[in-house]
Amino acid sequence: MLGLNSGGDVHIARLDALPVAAIIPSVTPEGYSGDIAMIVGVNFDGSVAGVRVVEHKETPGLGDKVDLRKSDWILGFNGKSLKNPEPNAWNVKKEQGEFDQFTGATITPRAVVHQIAKTLEYFNQDKQRLLNELSSAYNQLS
C-alpha cells in the first residue's frame, strides 16, 4: 500500500513518553519521472503533522515543486485528514479535488496527493497495532 520494498520503519513521536504522532515512510511509483519518496507525519488524531518529499526525479521547474526547497505547496497538507477534506476530495483541483496542481504539471501533485491519502488510510487501519507494537518496543528499551 505504501510502496515500500521492505517493511519500512514507522517511528513514533512522543511528548513526555506519550505517543503523539507517527512518522511513516511512503513511496509512490506514480510520479511523472518515477518514484517519489516521502515521509508523512500523522498525528494520533489522524491529521497530517507534516509531509516532506525526500527523493524524486521530477522535472526541474515543474514537478519538483513538491520539494519544500522549491515551493511551499507541500505545507498545504498540514492539518488535513481523511475527514477534512472528505476522501473523495483527496485529488487535485483539476479533478474536482481540494489540492492545487502546478501549471504544466498535474501528474506529480496528483501522485503525491493520492499517496498521502493512502498513508492516512494505512495509519487509520493499523493505528492500534502500530501503537501496541511500538509501545512494546519502546518499553523494552526503557
What do these predicted regions represent?
Residues 1-142:
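Flexible, solvent-exposed loop/hinge segments and secondary-structure transition points
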